[in-house]
Amino acid sequence: MRLAILGGIAVTPERVIEDAGILIDEDGRISFVDTREQLEECEDWEDEIELGEKDVIMPGLINTHTHGPMTLFRGVADDMPLMKWLREEIWPLEERLDAEKCRWGAALAAMEALKSGTTCLADMYFFMDAVAEAYAEVGIRAVISHGMIDLGEEDKREEELKESKRVYRKCQGMEGLIEFSLGPHAPYTCSEELLKEVRRLADEWGVKIQIHVAETEDEVKEVKRKHGKRPVEYLDEIGLLGDDVIAAHCVWLDDKEIEILSKRGVIVSHNPISNMKLASGISPVPEMLERGVNVTIGTDGCASNNNLDMLEEIKVAALLHKVNKMDPSATEMLEILRMATVRAGTVFSSEKIGAIEEGYAADLVVLDGSSPRLNPNHNPISNIVYSASGSDVKHVFVAGELVVKNGKLVKADEQEILENSTECAEQLTSS
């Protein structure tokens, strides 16, 4: 059944179209984008949704780095540096996780993400088959990976690869919203043998790789001590890097590493709020963009953010580099929006996502034009980047299916998700 979305202001993001007309085909892809008048003149359809005159319709936001089930850890460990935070708080809690807890944590993440305008997540965590099932049921698109850490131990390496292969098999045949990827945690927690096997499997299976890179200065020192090179140089030397790699953080880079990231086509996920909260540093985003690196935006997990609101994240990303450079033009609003939409669409392989253009998946977000934050609307892109909040989200479509209607989930029971995720969180943190 073909669906027409009529009215509102469409931000594609390359064009702004007033009184828009968008047609979604039977496969959940966009088949027409223009004005309502043009749509009515040359197309027909079976169903339609009428938007308010001031409503803004935009591509769904793409969160290129997160750990969905960590919603269960929201507010548990704050105001700590990364390694202390991991070793004393997060890793001990993660030892108590199981598939059921990760499933409900992921359901909560999907609920929060969709209701704040995110339609796709790149997620690295544990019990990822359960996470994938939760994401599919709630209705969000996701690239999932089992986070692998071997610390140079052969038995642990085999165990991690076995789990990744199990999740890979489980994900085969899942509905098209879910894609599998490989997830070596970081160059300081993964052996060279594991990283080389990840590259071999990624080539064999045709899947993405997700990895944390150069998040802290201490990580850079540790990798240099072990391997004699900085993290990006080391990963390039062993053959891991390519345009199928999603490198999260990339805070502590030198000029040579930026050139390598550009040359290899690596997808960088900039996580400004998490990096600020953990005082990890400021990623050299303007320098990377200038040299052609594909920089995207992610939230990281809820334990270090502490939410999944990508509209908040893009505003912080826009502002952080202005003040860091003492230059208000250091980052421009359209480029920031691209980083969270069409640039980020490269994380998903089987569909074109991240733009309102013909042939792209109909992953769409409608912002409520009656929100005071969106009025007056002199510039819709400015309002999206600098004014909007996740609470302004009215409707969300994923693959042409309405999954949020008037701010409420359509496919899942919100109360059930809240009750079960809260119970799981209490079990984790009870002594």
UniProtKB/Swiss-Prot annotation:
Coiled-coil zones: none
InterPro entries: Amidohydro-rel, Deaminase_MtaD/DadD, Metal-dep_hydrolase_composite, Metal_Hydrolase, MTA/SAH_deaminase
Positions that bind Zn(2+): 65, 67, 212, 300
Catalysed reactions listed for this entry: 5'-deoxyadenosine + H2O + H(+) = 5'-deoxyinosine + NH4(+); S-adenosyl-L-homocysteine + H2O + H(+) = S-inosyl-L-homocysteine + NH4(+); S-methyl-5'-thioadenosine + H2O + H(+) = S-methyl-5'-thioinosine + NH4(+); adenosine + H2O + H(+) = inosine + NH4(+)
GO terms assigned for molecular function: 5'-deoxyadenosine deaminase activity; 5'-methylthioadenosine deaminase activity; adenosine deaminase activity; metal ion binding; S-adenosylhomocysteine deaminase activity
Cofactor(s) recorded in Swiss-Prot or TrEMBL: Zn(2+)
Signal peptide: none
Cofactor notes: Binds 1 zinc ion per subunit.
GO terms for biological process, alphabetical: S-adenosylmethionine biosynthetic process
Top enzyme category: hydrolase
Keyword Kinase included in the entry's annotation: no
Biological or metabolic pathway of the protein: Amino-acid biosynthesis; S-adenosyl-L-methionine biosynthesis
Positions contributing to substrate binding: 94, 185, 215, 300
EC identifiers of the protein: 3.5.4.41, 3.5.4.31, 3.5.4.4, 3.5.4.28
Presence of the UniProt keyword Cell cycle in the record: no
Alphabetical list of SUPFAM superfamilies matching this protein: Composite domain of metallo-dependent hydrolases (SSF51338), Metallo-dependent hydrolases (SSF51556)
Entry function: Catalyzes the deamination of three SAM-derived enzymatic products, namely 5'-deoxyadenosine, S-adenosyl-L-homocysteine, and 5'-methylthioadenosine, to produce the inosine analogs. Can also deaminate adenosine. The preferred substrate for this enzyme is 5'-deoxyadenosine, but all these substrates are efficiently deaminated. Likely functions in a S-adenosyl-L-methionine (SAM) recycling pathway from S-adenosyl-L-homocysteine (SAH) produced from SAM-dependent methylation reactions.
Name used for this protein in its record: 5'-deoxyadenosine deaminase
Lineage, top ranks: Archaea, Methanobacteriati, Methanobacteriota, Methanomada group, Methanopyri
Gene label: dadD
